[in-house]
């Protein structure tokens, strides 16, 4: 418990907060499952001017041969982290092997890297998605919107 931190469960894209409430809005491993345009409009509504939107999520993309050194390094780090955090790793494995998790993935597949990258980088010009960890067919990525000012809207449709 922390007096300046709270977690909220929401249903649908409407966020139950006043306009300009937050300095930072985060999405951890969930943005890929949501309807991006309505949610992003709500996130911008609840952010204070100059606020940031931070995302850590998973995308799907096969590893290229030129990326094998990075893949090996990330695999070794992941194995080391799993050993160091065995209790967390066991809980994670239990979660992702649960039938409800598998059913959820059936209806909400992981987004492709190029789709999420295009979406975020086109709506926050000058900002870049970054790979945190690489696996054979997926990556953990991070995105920092940078300071977001009110009234700046990039209206685009997916090509």
Across the structure, where does each feature detected by a protein language model lie?
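Conserved SAM-binding strand-loop segment of SAM-dependent methyltransferases
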Residues: 2-18
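A conserved beta-strand element that flanks and buttresses the S-adenosyl-L-methionine
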Residues: 26
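A short His-aromatic
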Residues: 29-33
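A short glycine-rich, Lys/Arg-flanked "PGG" loop and its adjoining helix->strand segment in the class I
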Residues: 37-49
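Conserved class I S-adenosyl-L-methionine
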Residues: 54-86
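Short, glycine-/aromatic-enriched active-site segment of Class I SAM-dependent methyltransferases
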Residues: 93-106
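Short alpha-helix
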Residues: 106-128
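Conserved S-adenosyl-L-methionine
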Residues: 126-136
């Amino acid at each position: 418990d922390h007096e300046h931190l709270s977690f909220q469960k929401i249903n649908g894209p409407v966020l139950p907060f006043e306009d300009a409430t937050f300095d930072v809005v985060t999405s951890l491993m969930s943005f890929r499952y949501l309807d991006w345009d309505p949610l992003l409009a709500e996130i911008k509504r609840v952010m204070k001017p100059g606020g940031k939107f931070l995302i850590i999520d998973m995308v799907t993309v096969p590893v290229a041969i030129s990326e094998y050194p990075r893949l090996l390094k990330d695999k070794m780090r992941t194995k080391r982290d799993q050993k160091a955090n065995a209790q967390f790793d066991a809980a994670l494995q239990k979660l992702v092997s649960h039938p409800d998790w598998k059913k959820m993935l059936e209806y909400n597949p992981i987004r492709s890297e190029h789709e999420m990258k295009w979406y975020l980088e086109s709506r926050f010009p000058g900002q870049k998605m970054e790979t945190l960890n690489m696996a054979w067919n997926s990556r953990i990525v991070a995105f920092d919107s940078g300071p977001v000012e009110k009234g700046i809207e990039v209206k685009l449709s997916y090509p």
